[in-house]
Design a protein with these regions (language model features):
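RecB-family 4Fe-4S metal-dependent nuclease core
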Residues: 1-143
Length: 143
Protein backbone atom coordinates (compact mmCIF):
# COMPACT_ATOMS: atom_id res chain seq x y z
CA UNK A 1 0.00 0.00 0.00
CA UNK A 2 2.14 2.86 -1.35
CA UNK A 3 0.96 6.30 -0.22
CA UNK A 4 3.71 8.54 -1.54
CA UNK A 5 2.68 11.93 -2.87
CA UNK A 6 4.04 13.17 -6.18
CA UNK A 7 3.42 16.62 -7.69
CA UNK A 8 2.99 16.32 -11.45
CA UNK A 9 2.24 19.18 -13.81
CA UNK A 10 0.60 18.22 -17.11
CA UNK A 11 1.82 20.14 -20.15
CA UNK A 12 0.51 20.02 -23.71
CA UNK A 13 3.91 19.83 -25.41
CA UNK A 14 7.53 21.02 -25.21
CA UNK A 15 8.90 17.76 -23.86
CA UNK A 16 12.57 18.76 -24.18
CA UNK A 17 11.99 22.11 -22.48
CA UNK A 18 10.34 20.62 -19.38
CA UNK A 19 12.84 17.77 -19.10
CA UNK A 20 15.61 20.38 -19.14
CA UNK A 21 13.88 22.48 -16.47
CA UNK A 22 14.20 19.52 -14.12
CA UNK A 23 17.76 18.67 -15.18
CA UNK A 24 18.87 22.30 -14.78
CA UNK A 25 17.05 22.83 -11.47
CA UNK A 26 14.77 25.57 -12.81
CA UNK A 27 11.41 23.95 -12.04
CA UNK A 28 10.06 26.79 -9.91
CA UNK A 29 6.40 26.08 -10.68
CA UNK A 30 6.76 22.52 -9.38
CA UNK A 31 8.61 23.80 -6.31
CA UNK A 32 5.68 26.13 -5.59
CA UNK A 33 3.27 23.20 -5.89
CA UNK A 34 5.47 21.14 -3.57
CA UNK A 35 5.50 23.94 -1.00
CA UNK A 36 1.71 24.17 -1.10
CA UNK A 37 1.34 20.39 -0.75
CA UNK A 38 3.68 20.39 2.24
CA UNK A 39 1.69 23.19 3.89
CA UNK A 40 -1.60 21.36 3.31
CA UNK A 41 -0.53 17.79 4.13
CA UNK A 42 2.42 18.28 6.47
CA UNK A 43 4.73 16.28 4.19
CA UNK A 44 6.61 17.27 1.06
CA UNK A 45 6.03 15.28 -2.13
CA UNK A 46 8.38 12.36 -2.72
CA UNK A 47 9.03 13.57 -6.26
CA UNK A 48 8.13 16.26 -8.77
CA UNK A 49 7.52 15.84 -12.45
CA UNK A 50 5.99 16.80 -15.77
CA UNK A 51 3.62 14.67 -17.84
CA UNK A 52 3.65 15.69 -21.51
CA UNK A 53 0.22 15.12 -23.05
CA UNK A 54 1.38 15.24 -26.68
CA UNK A 55 3.93 12.43 -26.32
CA UNK A 56 2.86 10.64 -23.16
CA UNK A 57 6.33 11.18 -21.66
CA UNK A 58 6.67 11.43 -17.90
CA UNK A 59 9.73 13.15 -16.44
CA UNK A 60 10.22 12.85 -12.72
CA UNK A 61 12.88 13.75 -10.15
CA UNK A 62 13.09 10.37 -8.37
CA UNK A 63 13.39 6.77 -9.49
CA UNK A 64 11.19 3.82 -8.49
CA UNK A 65 7.90 5.72 -8.42
CA UNK A 66 6.48 5.26 -11.92
CA UNK A 67 7.92 2.31 -13.86
CA UNK A 68 8.09 4.02 -17.28
CA UNK A 69 9.03 7.51 -16.11
CA UNK A 70 12.26 9.10 -17.25
CA UNK A 71 14.27 10.35 -14.28
CA UNK A 72 15.65 13.88 -14.54
CA UNK A 73 17.39 14.80 -11.30
CA UNK A 74 18.15 18.44 -10.58
CA UNK A 75 21.76 19.40 -9.86
CA UNK A 76 23.11 18.73 -6.38
CA UNK A 77 22.02 21.43 -3.97
CA UNK A 78 18.87 22.36 -5.89
CA UNK A 79 15.89 21.54 -3.69
CA UNK A 80 12.37 22.83 -3.25
CA UNK A 81 13.66 24.92 -0.34
CA UNK A 82 16.50 26.47 -2.37
CA UNK A 83 14.22 27.27 -5.32
CA UNK A 84 11.62 28.85 -3.04
CA UNK A 85 14.36 30.78 -1.21
CA UNK A 86 15.67 32.14 -4.50
CA UNK A 87 12.14 33.10 -5.54
CA UNK A 88 11.67 34.95 -2.24
CA UNK A 89 15.01 36.73 -2.66
CA UNK A 90 14.01 37.71 -6.20
CA UNK A 91 10.67 39.05 -4.98
CA UNK A 92 12.42 41.11 -2.30
CA UNK A 93 14.89 42.53 -4.85
CA UNK A 94 12.21 43.37 -7.43
CA UNK A 95 9.86 44.81 -4.79
CA UNK A 96 12.69 47.08 -3.64
CA UNK A 97 13.14 48.27 -7.22
CA UNK A 98 9.42 48.99 -7.58
CA UNK A 99 9.35 50.83 -4.24
CA UNK A 100 12.19 53.00 -5.56
CA UNK A 101 10.27 53.70 -8.77
CA UNK A 102 12.49 51.50 -10.94
CA UNK A 103 10.89 49.35 -13.62
CA UNK A 104 13.55 47.39 -15.45
CA UNK A 105 12.96 46.46 -19.09
CA UNK A 106 15.11 43.43 -19.71
CA UNK A 107 16.38 42.85 -23.26
CA UNK A 108 16.71 39.49 -24.97
CA UNK A 109 19.92 37.77 -23.84
CA UNK A 110 20.47 40.30 -21.03
CA UNK A 111 24.04 41.19 -20.03
CA UNK A 112 25.24 40.55 -16.47
CA UNK A 113 24.19 44.02 -15.30
CA UNK A 114 20.56 42.84 -15.39
CA UNK A 115 21.20 39.95 -13.01
CA UNK A 116 20.02 40.27 -9.44
CA UNK A 117 22.00 39.93 -6.24
CA UNK A 118 23.44 36.57 -5.21
CA UNK A 119 20.72 34.14 -4.24
CA UNK A 120 18.13 35.40 -6.75
CA UNK A 121 16.75 33.59 -9.78
CA UNK A 122 18.53 34.21 -13.09
CA UNK A 123 17.16 36.99 -15.30
CA UNK A 124 16.74 35.64 -18.82
CA UNK A 125 14.77 38.31 -20.66
CA UNK A 126 11.89 37.78 -23.06
CA UNK A 127 11.34 34.16 -24.07
CA UNK A 128 10.47 33.67 -27.70
CA UNK A 129 6.85 33.25 -28.70
CA UNK A 130 5.30 33.10 -25.24
CA UNK A 131 6.67 36.33 -23.82
CA UNK A 132 6.60 38.17 -27.11
CA UNK A 133 2.86 37.46 -27.52
CA UNK A 134 2.20 39.03 -24.14
CA UNK A 135 4.60 41.93 -24.67
CA UNK A 136 2.90 42.86 -27.94
CA UNK A 137 -0.35 43.17 -26.01
CA UNK A 138 1.43 45.57 -23.67
CA UNK A 139 2.65 47.69 -26.57
CA UNK A 140 6.20 46.61 -27.28
CA UNK A 141 8.54 44.20 -29.02
CA UNK A 142 6.60 43.88 -32.27
CA UNK A 143 8.58 42.32 -35.09
Amino acid sequence: NDKRTVAIDMKWRSETYYAELLREGEHLQLALYAGLIEQAKGNAPTALGYFILESGALYITAADIFPNAQVRRPPDGVTVATLLGRAQATWTWRKGQLDAGVVEVVPEDPPDEFQGPDGTLPVKGPNGKFDRDHLVLLGGWER
